[in-house]
C-alpha cells in the first residue's frame, strides 16, 4: 500500500505540529511537505520511515 505523509500522520492521530516535532522540523516545513510544495531530504525521509515503520517505496511524495 502507498501512503501520503498526511495519511501516515493521520494513522497516529497526530496534528501537523506533533508530526513536525517528532521529525524535528518546523510545522511550516511539515505542512509544505504534505502540500507537496517542498520535499524532505534523505535524513528526514529516514526519520519518517522509522517513525511510521514504512518503507521508502511505500511513501508517496508527488
Question: Model features per residue range: what roles?
Answer:
Residues 1-11:
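A short, Lys/Arg-rich alpha-helix, primarily the initiator
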Amino acid at each position: 500500500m502507498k501512503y501520503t505523509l498526511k495519511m501516515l500522520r493521520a494513522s497516529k492521530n497526530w496534528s501537523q505540529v506533533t508530526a513536525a516535532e517528532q521529525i524535528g522540523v518546523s510545522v511550516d516545513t511539515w505542512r509544505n511537505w504534505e502540500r507537496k510544495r517542498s520535499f524532505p531530504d534523505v535524513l528526514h525521509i529516514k526519520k519518517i520511515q522509522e517513525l511510521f515503520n514504512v518503507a521508502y517505496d511505500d511513501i508517496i511524495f508527488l
